[in-house]
């Protein structure tokens, strides 16, 4: 071996020692029961793209919107915990039967603005993280729904107009509140809503203007009452074993992606309601923005027991969250 060969071999050896090992490419399928055009879908697209770019292509996330992967939101929590799904974007009120803490953002009339919804999320985030941790999961970010109202085939502006209306709610909180107020409310997954509207199984829906716009509710309904019931959260969570298998750089990339998605989702609230209302009215929906205070009072009173029932289930943590939130809002 001559001196050139010796130096070349030595240089190659040094380069191999100095070069970091390339991270193995991770391919994840990400479930989401809602449409790609929703706030949650658009934030998820940002999340997947940023994760890919920040990881140098070593994190490859394929989004499955509209429940197309075969899981509804109510099934996501257990599926991610068990590893059947590596990651999901989930409407958390629908899994409150498993972990009651997740009902928090759906409590009736607790928040009245985007800033209050953000404050509640900031206060409660450590508690959410703890719940995910004890269920073999990592919480990555939350995306908010705009305020929920009642979509129906008529103006819902009083107890009389609500009485007997078959209204879908997404969780136990909404179901209880509407039933107490006189509606024939039932809890139903999002994927089942449009088929039930089409068949006459329901004739009203408690959801945001955003949700109904994305699902083109004007094909079945005529009115939206902006009662501002709640601003519930979707959360993106990943199986802890899958997360732990990532390299340090990949986990950092995932954190960067989660922040980008969070910024996208919360930032969209500033203009989304006005955009939704304009599209709804262009498609023939009567938007009732000034809902009578008497009706709002009825709904608020009807939802009072939801708070006491929730606090019985979550105990001191719930009291601490509500106290901190009310002190900061």
Regions found by a protein language model. Name each.
Residues 1-2:
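N-terminal secretory signal peptides that target proteins for export/translocation
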Residues 10-11, 21:
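Cleavable N-terminal signal peptides
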Residues 17-23:
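Sec/Tat signal peptide C-region and signal peptidase I cleavage site
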């Amino acid at each position: 071996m001559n001196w050139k060969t010796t130096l070349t071999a030595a240089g190659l050896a040094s380069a191999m020692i100095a070069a970091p090992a390339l991270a193995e490419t991770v391919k994840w399928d990400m479930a989401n029961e809602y449409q790609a055009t929703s706030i949650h879908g658009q934030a998820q697209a940002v999340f997947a793209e940023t994760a890919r770019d920040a990881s140098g292509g070593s994190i490859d996330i394929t989004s499955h919107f509209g429940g197309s992967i075969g899981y509804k939101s109510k099934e996501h929590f257990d599926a991610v915990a068990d590893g059947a799904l590596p990651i999901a974007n989930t409407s958390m009120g629908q899994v409150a039967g498993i972990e009651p803490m997740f009902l928090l953002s759906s409590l009736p009339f607790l928040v009245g603005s985007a800033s209050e919804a953000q404050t509640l999320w900031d206060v409660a985030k450590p508690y959410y993280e703890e719940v995910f941790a004890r269920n073999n999961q990592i919480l990555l970010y939350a995306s908010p729904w705009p305020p929920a109202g009642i979509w129906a085939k008529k103006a819902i502006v009083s107890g009389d107009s609500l009485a007997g209306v078959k209204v879908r709610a997404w969780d136990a909180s909404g179901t209880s509140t509407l039933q107490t107020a006189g509606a024939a409310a039932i809890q139903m997954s999002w994927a089942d809503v449009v088929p039930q509207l089409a068949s006459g199984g329901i004739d009203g829906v408690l959801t945001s203007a955003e949700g109904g716009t994305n699902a083109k509710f004007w094909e079945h309904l005529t009115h939206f009452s902006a009662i501002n019931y709640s601003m519930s959260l979707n959360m993106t969570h990943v199986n802890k074993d899958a997360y732990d298998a990532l390299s340090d750089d990949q986990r950092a990339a995932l954190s960067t992606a989660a922040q980008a998605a969070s910024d996208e989702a919360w930032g969209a609230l500033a203009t989304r309601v006005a955009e939704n209302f304009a599209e709804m009215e262009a498609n023939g929906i009567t938007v009732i923005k000034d809902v009578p205070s008497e009706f709002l009072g009825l709904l608020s009173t009807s939802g009072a027991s939801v708070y006491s029932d929730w606090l019985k289930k979550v105990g001191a943590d719930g009291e601490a969250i509500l106290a901190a939130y009310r002190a900061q809002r």
